[in-house]
């Protein structure tokens, strides 16, 4: 990222290691909290540097550091949080002493709170008023998805449905056709597609 020109990028999506001890080939994912946050601050500084003034930054992160990341991006780097989205997925983490985890946090951050790209018409979904009630007062163009995203398995691969407060996209499992290589945390194309359509 250091080789990119300052102010040259419209949209950045980052899915960094969550610092939960995952076995990566080239990265130690069990740093002390202070070291992890310092490392994070260094690469976010580069993200902010390369973003255009009206640029958008999306960050995917787990529970462990979600709050710290939001504060860091707002207070240290002056970004504005437009949305804090919850991505709900299948194939969650099986836990023994707490509820199973089946979500991640997606922060939609912008440099300028008044000038940024948000293509609402590109991500509209049918409303309950349209689908459930057949109400003629419903906007024929649908509505914006809520801040929790759902893509149900029965809707794959042709489309998606956003239910209240949840973005649901299944994680990319080993048998999925879109699976590339052996990376255990590959993001689904449809989730990234929604972000790209909305923000570029």
Go through each PLM region and give its residues.
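Core catalytic lobe of class I
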Residues: 1-200
